[in-house]
């Protein structure tokens, strides 16, 4: 059963950000994770609205670069990391990422290997991340190393995207009266444990794009190509080594053929497996 509020999702999201900054700013590290996608774009700019209200000048923004990122995604991330109110953390450290497909591992930024693209000049490349791990555990390791065990990270998950996210973000309180997150709590000494919050958990895809277009917010231009191939809800920007990226690979071949060749040569067996399963 659905219960509707008198507030719209935009007003509700702003209230959530106000709560986050009011309760935790200056008391624990607050960060925003971005992927280059539409949801993290909205998160970033909603945060800026509330930062302006509260007189907050900058916020740490983390991009955990998985190497096999589309050129247009990287172009957009460079724009984000140069915004005057962003404190940039662009991580390009080695780890082996698992993609749940029978031994398909990818040596992200593998030492001595020929990468899909060169690293950024000021990126963070010396973090020690457990090599064989899921992405969620890898980014947790990154956040712990950069911001400490009491970090509060803000992300862009939404319940519309999957039943699993619906269950995760509507059950189990992480703060009093708040279920739209994970982890949380305190240690025996009263200090904070790590916490991740998702303030746009109840937004629909149309809400996301309405906010972006209404406010004329720059976004990753890869979406413009995806709009011509897929329904709006199916347009996603993510690392190209994920299994679902098979739907995007033909488009990457068309718009960035040089990068596509480097990507396939980088991990040719991975993409052979993906293409075979897609057929």
Residue positions per predicted region:
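Nucleotide-activated chemistry modules centered on ATP-dependent adenylation/adenylyltransferase
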Residues: 1-33, 38-279
């Amino acid at each position: 059963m659905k219960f509707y509020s008198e507030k719209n999702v935009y007003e509700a999201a702003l209230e959530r950000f106000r709560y986050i900054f009011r309760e935790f700013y200056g008391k624990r590290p607050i960060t925003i994770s971005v992927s280059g996608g539409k949801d993290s774009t909205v998160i970033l700019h909603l945060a800026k609205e509330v930062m302006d209200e509260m007189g907050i000048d900058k916020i740490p923004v983390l991009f955990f670069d998985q190497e096999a990122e589309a050129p247009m995604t990287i172009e957009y991330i460079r724009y984000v990391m140069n915004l005057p109110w962003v404190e940039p953390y662009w991580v390009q450290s080695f780890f082996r990422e698992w993609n749940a497909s029978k031994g398909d591992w990818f040596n992200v930024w593998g030492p001595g290997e020929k990468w899909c693209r060169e690293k950024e000049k000021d990126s963070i490349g010396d973090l020690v991340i457990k090599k064989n791990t899921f992405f969620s555990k890898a980014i947790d390791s990154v956040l712990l190393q950069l911001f400490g065990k009491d970090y509060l990270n803000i992300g862009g998950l939404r319940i519309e995207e999957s039943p699993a996210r619906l269950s995760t973000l509507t059950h189990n309180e992480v703060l009093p009266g708040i279920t739209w997150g994970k982890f949380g709590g305190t240690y025996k000494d009263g200090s904070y444990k790590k916490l991740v919050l998702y303030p746009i958990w109840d937004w629909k895809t149309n809400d996301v794009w309405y906010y972006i277009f209404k406010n004329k917010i720059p976004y990753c231009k890869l979406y413009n190509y995806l709009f011509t191939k897929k329904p709006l809800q199916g347009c996603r920007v993510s690392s190209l080594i994920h299994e679902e990226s098979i739907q995007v690979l033909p488009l990457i071949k068309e718009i960035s053929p040089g990068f596509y060749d480097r990507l396939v040569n980088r991990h040719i067996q991975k993409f052979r497996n993906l293409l075979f399963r897609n057929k």
